[in-house]
């Protein structure tokens, strides 16, 4: 979503690219524990990482990270759960995430999901810093662990209904509350 980025192997020193930049693996499953994720402050520093295959780069976004799992049915968002990251980090890993039914994504993030996932049924995870989307995956965060941690069987049942039966039971919505928690 408007992010200046590209494949690292195609990046050459360029006066139009403002440093710092951020580099990371192109495939999300290869970034566990922020492996091979770096803030690059100079073109000389970048040369240390050029040999690593399948990296991407993006502008560095100095803003708090958030993440939202959306559940869609035929392109309509039927549920969302937003995870707020701690401002403190160890490397690029947050100290904690705050999960609450009161957390809401930025409207611009939801608008992007509605526009680009028109007709989609299932789960989508959107990670963003400020109003810039940095990663999108057709999955729940952490394999659904945060949803399971709500310990709300009605919420879990309704999400399963979307995937297994292409159905969202709106009658369960008043039973889908859960207590806020930190992870």
What are the roles of these predicted feature ranges?
Residues 88, 101-183:
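ATP-dependent carboxylate activation and anion-phosphoryl transfer catalytic cores
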Residues 1-112:
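Active-site nucleotide/adenylate-binding loops and adjacent lid/helix of ATP-dependent enzymes
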């Amino acid at each position: 979503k408007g992010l200046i980025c590209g494949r690292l192997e195609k990046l050459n020193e360029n006066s139009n690219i403002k440093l710092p930049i951020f580099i990371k693996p192109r495939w999300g499953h290869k970034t566990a524990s922020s492996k091979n994720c770096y803030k690059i402050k100079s073109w000389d520093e970048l040369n240390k990482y050029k040999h690593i295959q399948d990296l991407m780069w993006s502008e560095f976004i100095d803003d708090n990270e958030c993440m939202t799992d959306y559940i869609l049915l035929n392109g309509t968002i039927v549920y969302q759960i937003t995870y707020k990251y701690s401002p403190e980090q160890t490397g690029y890993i947050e100290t904690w995430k705050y999960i609450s039914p009161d957390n809401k994504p930025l409207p611009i993030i939801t608008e992007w999901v509605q526009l680009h996932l028109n007709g989609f049924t299932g789960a989508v995870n959107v990670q963003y810093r400020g109003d810039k989307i940095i990663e999108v995956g057709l999955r729940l965060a952490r394999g659904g662990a945060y949803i399971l941690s709500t310990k709300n069987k009605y919420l879990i049942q309704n999400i399963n209904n979307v995937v297994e039966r292409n159905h969202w039971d709106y009658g369960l919505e008043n039973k889908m509350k859960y207590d806020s928690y930190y992870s």
